[in-house]
């Protein structure tokens, strides 16, 4: 009778249940079995009773006592763990062993059109108001078509009676400034309209001579237009504040024969042709930033 009441095998292995054990046998403490998903070596299913053995046990217990039924157990559940690690491929480890989740293949899409590659639904940059570059793409010809200006309306006619607007006055003032002569400025040649609007300045040796207060000294470095002796920066005399542009630049040549290289026995003033700025009255340029060796220097004026 005990063989029918108590099942000869443990119906609940792995959970440590006391049901189904022979009371005459000494009770042994069940060992905590490691979960199946932790052991990577075994890929066999757990040792649970299948549905056939459970139905057979239920039939035997119903003959002894209809109230005796096997204890409910986890039949359709399995222990599993999900490995989430950004450095390792995402995998699901269950009783059947580790299995890597694979992404489903993307659905077949239509071939990409050339217009789809140039879509910009957002602004091109933070500082750029352009939302779509296709709006500003040039046609195949390479130039944008010129739009014809709209014809003047009849409403613009009464505006002329009020007088010239400030925008119309600006070109008139510009024309007046261009016509008025500027001291020291060279008039551009009409033959060379594409001449750049800049000049090179050359530093030359000159002298300061005011005809009003009769002030004169030598060894004056003057900024002149390159290739000429015209003084670029013109100002009043520092002493009397009357004489305009007292700076002069003398030609570097002999004052007797008017040659750059000469062999005259006597000269009006001693001029070293190799270093023409070094004259008898010169001497203040020594050991200074603008020394005799750095006579000529160029400056770019825009």
UniProtKB/Swiss-Prot annotation:
A cellular-component GO term for this protein = cytoplasm
Q: Which molecular-function annotations from GO does this UniProt entry contain?
A: mRNA 3'-UTR binding; zinc ion binding
Q: Which InterPro entries match?
A: Zar1, ZAR1/RTP1-5-like_Znf-3CxxC
Q: What domain of life does the native source organism fall in? A: Eukaryota
Chief place of localization: cytoplasm
Provide the free-text tissue specificity comment from this protein's UniProt record. Oocyte-specific.
Comp. bias intervals (Basic and acidic residues): 159-178
The biological process GO terms on file are: negative regulation of translation; oocyte maturation; translation
Q: What does this protein do?
A: mRNA-binding protein required for maternal mRNA storage, translation and degradation during oocyte maturation. Probably promotes formation of some phase-separated membraneless compartment that stores maternal mRNAs in oocytes: acts by undergoing liquid-liquid phase separation upon binding to maternal mRNAs. Binds to the 3'-UTR of maternal mRNAs, inhibiting their translation.
Comment on protein domains: Disordered regions undergo liquid-liquid phase separation (LLPS) for the formation of membraneless compartments that store maternal mRNAs in oocytes. The 3CxxC-type mediates binding to the 3'-UTR of mRNAs.
Q: Supply the name of the protein.
A: Zygote arrest protein 2.S
Name the species this protein comes from: Xenopus laevis (African clawed frog)
């Amino acid at each position: 009778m005990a063989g029918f009441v108590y099942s000869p095998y443990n119906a609940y292995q792995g959970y440590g249940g006391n049901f189904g054990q022979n009371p005459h046998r000494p009770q042994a403490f069940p060992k905590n079995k490691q979960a199946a998903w932790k052991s990577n070596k075994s890929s066999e299913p757990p040792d649970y009773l299948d549905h056939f053995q459970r139905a057979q046990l239920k039939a035997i217990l119903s003959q002894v006592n209809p109230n005796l039924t096997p204890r409910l157990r986890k039949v359709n559940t399995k222990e599993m763990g999900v490995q989430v690690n950004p450095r390792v491929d995402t995998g699901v480890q269950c009783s059947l062993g580790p299995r890597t989740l694979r992404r489903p293949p993307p659905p077949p899409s239509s071939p990409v059109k050339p217009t789809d590659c140039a879509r910009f639904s957002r602004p091109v940059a933070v500082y750029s108001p352009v939302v779509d570059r296709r709006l500003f793409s040039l046609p195949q010809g390479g130039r944008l078509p010129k739009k014809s200006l709209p014809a003047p309306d009849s409403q613009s006619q009464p505006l002329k009676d009020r007088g010239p607007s400030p925008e119309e006055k600006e070109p008139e003032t510009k024309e007046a400034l261009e016509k008025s002569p500027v001291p020291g400025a060279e008039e551009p040649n009409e033959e060379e309209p594409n001449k750049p609007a800049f000049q090179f300045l050359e530093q030359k040796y000159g002298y300061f001579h005011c005809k009003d207060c009769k002030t004169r000294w030598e060894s004056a470095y003057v900024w002149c237009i390159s290739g000429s002796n015209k003084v670029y920066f013109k100002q009043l005399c520092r002493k009397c504040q009357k004489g305009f542009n007292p700076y002069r630049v003398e030609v570097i040549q002999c004052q007797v024969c008017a040659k750059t290289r000469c062999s005259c026995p006597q000269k009006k003033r001693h001029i070293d042709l190799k270093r023409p700025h070094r004259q008898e009255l010169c001497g203040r340029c020594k050991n200074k930033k603008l020394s005799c060796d750095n006579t000529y220097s160029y400056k770019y004026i825009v």
